[in-house]
Amino acid sequence: MGKLGYPCALAAATKHDVVGYDVSPHAKEILRTRRYPHRELRAQDLLEETALRVVDTVDEAVRHAEIVFVAVQTPHQPRFEGTERMPEDRADFDYGSLREAVGQVAEAAARLEKRVTVAVISTVLPGTMRREIYPILNEWTLFAYSPLFIAMGETIPNYLNPEFVLLGVDANRTGGREAADAVREVYGTLIPNVKIEEMSVASAELCKVFYNVFLGQKIVVANALMEIAHK
């Protein structure tokens, strides 16, 4: 779950029956104490109001779920943090945690012989799902890519009031249409009249990265204008 998945789960729990799973026992501790440890708008209120549960195993989560949203970190290397001059070479994100999470869901679905939709919401570079994730899926797992456009600290209001929902599916893959319909149903119930932009998985990967780059460039321009104004 983590800092992204937890507030998203709380938001989804306002309209859906939601269970969460995290490798860290900290997730259950938050529910036990009913105290949200991070600065996140509405998180404390929803922690007290919703019926979100956290289970102990991936099997329990898959047994309960029709759709599993995977929210794990895809970090870049520290040298790309921007605290020092950017290196000349380039490197992809680290997808180790993402591969492990999706793999555990696929294995659990196979053990339980239960079809489940896997919807990844993490940020990745174009081509990642085809290269890193598709080989992990099996006959029991349908797949969709639905990355979020949120700001940490405002995850819940951003999640519940999006400009649009980005949905990447590959219709030529078995179960692609079924996976798309599952994601549409979740968001349609949660956010009535929400605008859903559906496209291929590769196009959705590119759209998410370009959106992030565009926002970053706006910040760069704003900072440059501020520097000029100060001079």
Kindly give the residue locations of the regions a language model identified:
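Internal alpha-helical scaffold of NAD(P)-dependent oxidoreductase catalytic cores
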Residues: 131-146, 150-231
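Aromatic pocket-lining residues of Rossmann-like dinucleotide-binding sites
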Residues: 11-12
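Conserved N-terminal Rossmann-fold NAD(P) cofactor-binding segment
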Residues: 17-19, 23-67, 71-92, 99, ...
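Glycine-rich, N-terminal phosphate-binding loop of Rossmann-like dinucleotide-binding domains
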Residues: 70-72, 122, 169-170
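Rossmann-like NAD(P)(H) cofactor-binding subdomain of soluble oxidoreductases
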Residues: 76-154
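Local beta-strand N-terminus motif with an aromatic residue
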Residues: 64-65, 115, 162
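N-terminal Rossmann-fold NAD(P) dinucleotide-binding loop
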Residues: 2-6
